[in-house]
Amino acid sequence: MRKFLLRATCALALSAIAGQALAAPAMQVLGRDFSFPQPVEGLPAKLSDFKDLQINSFTTSDGVKLAYWEAGKGRPLIFVPGWSANGAEYINVMYLLSQHYRVIVLDPRNQGLSDQVAYGGRIARFSMDLKELTDHLGVKSADYCGWSMGAAVIWGYIDLFGTKGIRKACFVDEPISIYSHQDWTEQQRRDAGGTTTSAERMVAAVTQGGPANSLTTDMKPFERFMLRDSAAFANSEAFAAAVVKTDPDATARVLFDHVTNDWRDVVSHKIDVPVAIFSGEESNNLPSQRWAASVIPGARLYAYTAAEQGDHFLMFKNPVKFTTDLRAFLER
């Protein structure tokens, strides 16, 4: 009976999240506390330790209610998560940075606590959603940080709207073009970060459990994701799994468009603000991140070692180092 009541309570909470405007403390929106499984000094032991955390929402011009996580005061710092990711995974990053900034993490459409809809599954629409978030917040100038696909969303934003309003930008381990053109040289492929020559096979492998190998997709992020060799990462993933119910069919809608975009022209010609790029030696994306740092004027590359958790999930596995490095860049 207790299990039934718990499930019913959670279902009602999730229903309220999906159907109402959100503007409340995270504890109130989620309907319960959460205890992180592994104690980590300097990070919250329970959700209730993060008293400043709120979950809010706004509605886009095409009628989609998007959630965003917010904490802290000061200069705005806006995070855009990667494919299928959400603000809950940023719990430790937000906790550390909200002591210095107004930190905002957007749940993109079909991800996290945002609406699941059958339309708008394109990076260009995600970039418009980001623009509409800033308009909703009344933010005229902010620092932006995109991880994985979130970096592509910011590149799309820059392509559409330019860099006005972007004070500084941070990109974390996103290939410049996941799709590898068949007429590329090997050097061009490495510089762009291409990992597949078949977007269809890659999407099927990632979303439907289709056959996968290193010729259809980069297997390393999946291998590194399964490692729970960081207590902070284990905690943030446990929290996200407990409070966010991801629908694979919904998150899959943007993936084909994401895979086939080639951002080399935007990265090499349209970025004119200070940029930090994060990657590491446990990521196959490092060569493309070096290329990006070489073509963006004044860009700084942070390449983490294996001991520093330098893989696709570095910001979650080593949040103390990441937030320290990011703060140093933002305050330069």
How should each PLM-predicted stretch be described?
Residues 2-6, 22-77, 99-101, 139, ...:
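Alpha/beta-hydrolase fold catalytic core
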Residues 61, 69, 105-149, 160, ...:
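Active-site loop/oxyanion-hole signature of alpha/beta-hydrolase fold enzymes
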Residues 61-116:
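Conserved HGGG/HGGXW glycine-rich cap/lid loop of the alpha/beta-hydrolase fold
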Residues 84, 108-112, 151, 176, ...:
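Alpha/beta-hydrolase active-site loop signature
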Residues 155, 166-208:
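Flexible "cap/lid" loop of the alpha/beta hydrolase fold
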Residues 245-294:
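Conserved serine/cysteine hydrolase catalytic core
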Residues 299-332:
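Catalytic active-site module of serine/aspartate enzymes centered on a nucleophile-bearing elbow/loop
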